[in-house]
Amino acid sequence: MAGRGKTLGSGSAKKATTRSSKAGLQFPVGRIARFLKKGKYAERVGAGAPVYLAAVLEYLAAEVLELAGNAARDNKKTRIVPRHIQLAVRNDEELSKLLGDVTIANGGVMPNIHNLLLPKKTGASKPSAEDD
C-alpha cells in the first residue's frame, strides 16, 4: 500500500504554526475567525478579517492595560483593579469617547468638585482702589 497516506515513523512531522504567531499577535486569530463565522455577521468571512480584528483588539487591550497600570502605580498599588481601569479610561479623551456608554463594575466615579463649591480666592491679587 505504498503511496497512500502517511507512512508511520518516517521523517519528521512539520509543527503546526498558528495564524496568531504568523501575524505576530497574542490574541487568538482562529477563535476570532470562529466567532465571526458563528455570529452570522456576514455570509462569508475573508482570511484577513480575523487577523485585523485580533490586532485591533490586542492594541486596545494593551492601551487600556498600560494606562490602568500607570493609574495603579500612581496610587502606589501593584495590582490593577477595576477602579484603576475606570480612572485610566475616563482620563483618556479618546478611550472615554469610545467607552462613553460603558459602565465598569466596581469602577466608582470620577472625582469632581463643582467650581461653585470651592472656597473663594481671597488673595491680594488686585491692588485696592482705596489708596487714592
From Swiss-Prot:
**PTM summary:** Not ubiquitinated.
Q: What tissues contain this protein?
A: Low level of expression; mainly in roots. Found in the root cap cells and in non dividing tissues of the plant, including the root elongation and maturation zones and the leaf veins.
Q: Name one GO cellular component term.
A: nucleolus
According to the record's subunit comment, the protein's assembly and interactions are:
The nucleosome is a histone octamer containing two molecules each of H2A, H2B, H3 and H4 assembled in one H3-H4 heterotetramer and two H2A-H2B heterodimers. The octamer wraps approximately 147 bp of DNA.
Record PANTHER family: HISTONE H2A
- Looking at the record, which segments are called Disordered? 1-22
Q: Where in the cell is it found?
A: Nucleus; Chromosome
User: Cell membrane as a keyword?
Assistant: no
Q: What is this protein called?
A: Probable histone H2A.1
Q: Which domain of life is it from?
A: Eukaryota
What GO molecular function annotations does the UniProt record carry, in alphabetical order?
Answer: DNA binding; protein heterodimerization activity; structural constituent of chromatin
Q: Cite the source lineage.
A: Eukaryota, Viridiplantae, Streptophyta, Embryophyta, Tracheophyta
Q: Which CDD domains match?
A: HFD_H2A
Alphabetical keyword list: Chromosome, DNA-binding, Nucleosome core, Nucleus
